[in-house]
Amino acid sequence: IGIEVMREAVRVLETLEHKHALPLEFVMFDWGAEKYLREGVSLPPDALEMLRREFDAILIGALGDPRVPTNQHAVDILLGIRFGLDLYVNQRPVKLYDARLCPLKGRNELDLNFVIFRENTEGAYVGAGGMLRQGTDGEVAIQEDVNTRLGVERILVHAFEYARGRGLKKLCMSDKSNALAFGHGLWQRTFREVRERYLKIESRHLYVDALAMEMLRDPSQFEVIVTCNMFGDILSDLGAQLAGGLGLTPSANIHPGKT
């Protein structure tokens, strides 16, 4: 759906450009499945430096094509840009525009309006790990989950600053520290320290399984949610479905002050 989504997204931006006199300049690139299948190239060698030097924002449609079973082009583009430009904030607003789109019974537009902040450069998605005795009955697969104090603190601070800047009163941090004692223990300790800087915001913690249940039971209780990479990936898609589907829920990958 990438091409179709992009076509409509550009129409919206062009409307905003004319309505609000925004000085937008669009440059289109053919990066996607067609280019990958034709040339075997996902991103040109100088793509990241060119994007960093010449552009303020990057608009990407949905990536994926059954002709590329491994989705290698999508991995190269999304993760290449995300890690290459250190886009550590993934911001996923969840807003219901029409009650008929929500699968939950008796919910209306006022019940579903929150934002999920997902740490975007660490966790289980860094690609660290390996295989032992591959192809044997004793095969072992190891996938490492990497969390740093810098990475955890900066996404927590960004979420709190977002809440404060918009006059929001409630923030929920989610992890699984009862089972992932080391990595998510770091999330717990850092959260307790950072929340002391924002005492006017009602902040609380929920384990991710409890949070998923609460999002279904009463989504109106949430304003800002912040969590790790993998949990944010899952929860934001759950939120998207509550709002009517992925086609209605945008996603922004951000390095505040840069991209």
Language-model features: locations:
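N-terminal glycine-rich phosphate/adenylate-binding segment common to multiple enzyme folds
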Residues: 35-142, 230-232
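Short coil/turn connectors at secondary-structure junctions
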Residues: 22-24, 53-57, 86-87, 109-113, ...
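Glycine-rich phosphate/nucleotide-binding loop
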Residues: 214-259
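N-terminal beta-loop-helix "entrance" segment that forms/cooperates
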Residues: 19-45, 213-215
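Glycine-rich phosphate/diphosphate-binding loop of Rossmann-like nucleotide-binding domains
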Residues: 1-11, 15-19, 136-209, 221
